[in-house]
Design a protein with these regions (language model features):
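Terminal low-complexity tails and localization/encapsulation signals of metabolic enzymes
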Residues: 1-10, 242-244, 322-397
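Oxidoreductase and adenylate-handling cofactor-binding alpha/beta cores
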Residues: 149, 175-196, 209, 213-220, ...
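Glycine-rich beta-alpha junction loops
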Residues: 42, 129-130, 203-208, 245-247, ...
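Short, well-structured beta-strand/strand-turn elements
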Residues: 35, 308-322, 383-388
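A short glycine-threonine-serine/GTX helix/turn-capping micro-motif
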Residues: 163-174, 196-198, 227-232, 236-238, ...
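N-terminal helix-loop segment corresponding to the beta1-alpha1 unit
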Residues: 1-182, 186-192, 368, 374-397
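Aromatic-enriched alpha-helical interface/lid elements that frame and gate functional surfaces
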Residues: 237-310, 314
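Beta-strand segments within the central parallel beta-sheet cores of soluble alpha/beta enzyme folds
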Residues: 196-204, 305, 387-392
């Protein structure tokens, strides 16, 4: 298989940090895009200092999110650094940033300024609340955006507080994925028209749009989604069940044919005739029967029942180490080895994209801070003496 160059020719300057922007540009880099990560050595990306670390004291999280990207360190408060960015934009014409609204403009490298240099520039700004509105300059984090989007309240159990998820839904499903889709849509538009684009990604907007089912039911029909009252939020037997030894299984056997298989496996055949659209009371009675049945056996005993031949939509709740060893994920090669600068290899989560006849491109793990300063500046025509002077002046942090 050839290396995947499906985005070969797409050149990106990534000014973002933490998770939403870097994960988007990681996706692009995996697909063959050329990404330069513009960083500061004074205000280091927190993912660089989040343990655990490898033998070189480099953070594994950062090495994953920033693989295959070049790293340069610029003091964006210096005019020389701004000139370097403007030079790069003539070639690297996709910008991704995650600052609060107005920061890049004040630095002199906002969309309008860069558009003057390169009219084809695609500029994607990822923020918590968007470029407009009363909250546009308000700081926030993943759980804040989910809270304001109306998603968390009906995702909890009755009389229980919302649960913090292990995966940052607003950051990734909201920020990363919508930024990636937006940039690719803008790139297609540019290919047809020659025009660049400003893309305003609000993570709150994006996760608000994820209220697709219950949000549509409320906006169209006035039905307010309630905790543990809906088919998919615990109001039916579509839920998680504890085993005798304290592990859990997920049950999604909603359709009649799957419910039949579930009832047979749990040895409650008398409940097979309960249909999908039964009353809430009947649903709860059935759920209680499922709950009691699961408590009768251990996790390992249920694994023998709900084995790879069972087709009734029941799966064990795996730990992450168990997921890494699951035969399905191993068959899909979802863990790969990626080279480090010292020639050794590091295991990482693979790109999930499977293209016919091609494979993802993993050049190297996330670079050390400023590792590519000289390489990038030499490509812009700077000589060794000029680069040395920029370092001494603090332009290269």
């Amino acid at each position: 298989l050839e290396d995947l160059g499906i985005l070969k020719g797409l050149k990106i300057l990534d000014f973002s940090a933490l998770l939403p922007g870097p994960m988007a540009t990681m996706i692009f880099a995996d697909l063959g895009a050329d990404v330069i990560h513009v960083e500061s050595s004074k205000r280091v990306d927190l993912t660089r200092i989040m343990p655990p670390y490898d033998d070189d004291h480099e953070a594994y999280i950062h090495q994953h999110l920033n693989r295959s990207k070049k790293s340069i360190t610029l003091n964006l408060k210096s005019p020389e650094a701004i000139d370097i960015v403007k030079s790069l934009v003539q070639e690297y014409d996709v910008i991704i940033e995650g600052f609060r609204p107005g920061v890049m403009q004040r630095l002199g490298i906002g969309y309008e300024a860069l558009k003057e240099i390169n009219p084809k520039v695609i500029y994607c700004a990822i923020t918590g609340y968007g470029q407009t509105g009363p909250y546009s300059n308000r700081p926030g984090h993943d759980n804040n955006y989910l809270s304001l989007a109306g998603l968390l309240d009906y995702s909890r159990h009755k009389d229980k507080k919302p649960v913090s998820m292990g995966v940052q839904l607003a950051d990734i499903a909201g920020g990363t994925m919508h930024a990636a889709i937006g940039v690719l849509a803008a790139a297609l538009h540019r290919e047809k028209t020659g025009e660049g684009q400003f893309i305003d990604i609000s993570m709150t907007d994006a996760v608000f749009s994820l209220n697709a089912m219950y949000g549509a039911a409320f906006i169209g029909g006035g039905r307010v989604p309630q905790p543990e009252q809906e088919i998919l939020n615990g109001g039916s037997y579509y839920d998680f069940y504890k085993t005798k030894d304290g592990r859990f299984f997920s049950v999604g056997s909603l359709e009649p044919q799957f419910r039949k298989l579930l009832c047979e496996a749990l040895d409650i055949p008398e409940l097979i005739d309960n249909t999908f659209n039964d009353s809430y009371y009947t649903q709860i009675r059935f759920k209680e029967a499922v709950h009691d049945a699961f408590l009768s056996k251990t996790y390992e005993e249920w694994l023998e029942v709900f084995n790879e031949d069972f087709e009734g939509c029941v799966e064990p709740v795996l730990t992450f180490p168990e997921a890494c060893e699951h035969p399905q994920l191993k068959a899909r090669e979802m863990i790969v080895t990626i080279p480090k600068s010292d020639g050794t290899m590091q295991k990482q989560i693979a790109s999930p994209f499977k293209f016919d006849g091609t494979q993802p491109e993993y050049k190297h793990v996330g670079a050390k801070l400023g590792e590519h300063n000289e390489e990038v500046l030499l490509s812009l025509g700077f000589n060794a003496e000029q680069i040395k002077a920029l370092k001494e002046k603090g332009v290269l942090e």
